[in-house]
Design a protein with these regions (language model features):
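Alpha-helix termini
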Residues: 20-27
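Short Gly/Pro-enriched turn/cap motifs at secondary-structure boundaries
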Residues: 5-7, 144-145, 258-259
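Generic alpha-helix structural propensity
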Residues: 7-12, 53
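Gram-negative (and chloroplast) outer-membrane scaffold detector with strong preference
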Residues: 12, 16-18
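C-terminal structural cap/anchor segments
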Residues: 215-270
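Signature for the C-terminal beta-barrel architecture of outer-membrane proteins
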Residues: 15, 27-33, 38-224, 266-270
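Extended ligand-binding groove/face enriched in aromatic
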Residues: 4-9, 27
């Protein structure tokens, strides 16, 4: 008789409470706060931070829903190795987000967004449930390090006349107190840009997509110019139906990936 093994791993993926703070007008403008394990997407397409995690969020709108805002902070949980669900363990990483949306900005049907994100990553040494070292990433000089990265972004989504437009631009700056490839502390200065334009004619949609993330031509100097996200999951240029976005590509059997699953950015993370 073959042995049958059972494994029970309790997880709580999403659970939150929401309080309605006040009404701002008779047109359903409001302010509210939500606390707990909750989903959050920092922009229209999930370019920088798109996750379900433990946090608190104040959000609302005014001006007949023309203006909307979010102010949120997340105390990130570790992910289960095999299911990728949230565990109850603290990851040692805090993420803060503030963004503002303006509907019908310049053109009717076009919504603009401005964002600020802070990634304060103090995660120490961590092995996954399969015994692999995943933090710090085993590439270059392997040593615990803290990363403070700050993102400024402008994004937009909607249509200008009959042309559908989605775009985003992010500048990230900050400091890594020990970069494994450089073997020294580095300052962060990197950029990302995305543009998707489409046009509908009868039953056909003609679409073109462009995505750019800056690289680092000299990873051993004191400036890190390669763009990386906090935890992206972009719905762009095919999103989860794109082979490049859906798959993570491993480097030579190590726990380091050229890029992560559900990401567009090559980042050498584990």
């Amino acid at each position: 008789v073959e042995d049958i093994q059972f494994r029970v791993i309790p997880k709580l993926q999403q659970a939150f409470g929401e309080i309605h703070l006040l009404d701002l007008s008779e047109n359903y403008d409001f302010a509210a706060v939500r606390v707990g394990l909750q989903s959050f997407n920092s922009d229209f397409r999930g370019f920088v931070f798109n996750d379900i995690n433990l946090g608190a969020r104040v959000f609302g709108n005014w001006g007949n829903n023309r203006y909307q805002y979010n102010i949120a902070g997340f105390d990130m949980r570790e992910k289960d190795t095999n299911s990728e669900l949230n565990s109850f363990d603290d990851r040692g990483q805090e993420v803060m987000v503030a963004n503002f949306f303006w509907q019908d900005f310049l053109w009717k049907g076009y919504t603009a967004q401005w964002s600020f994100l802070a990634n304060l990553d103090h995660g120490g040494t961590h092995y996954d449930q399969n015994g692999n070292l995943v933090r710090p990433g085993p590439i270059g000089t392997v040593r615990e390090h803290d990363v403070h990265a700050y993102y400024l972004g402008w994004a937009g989504d909607g249509h200008i006349g009959r042309v559908n437009v989605t775009h985003a631009f992010y500048e990230v700056f900050g400091h890594d107190d020990f970069n494994g490839l450089a073997g020294q502390p580095v300052d962060i200065n990197a950029q990302m840009a995305a543009l998707e334009v489409s046009y509908d004619r009868d039953w056909v949609r003609y679409k073109g997509s462009f995505y750019y993330a800056s690289g680092d031509h000299n990873p051993e100097d004191g400036t890190a110019t390669g763009f990386d996200t906090i935890l992206d999951n972009p719905n762009f240029s095919g999103g989860p139906f794109s082979y490049w976005a859906r798959q993570g590509f491993n480097l030579g059997g190590t726990s380091v990936n050229l890029k992560q699953r559900n990401s567009l950015v090559p980042n050498l993370r584990s």
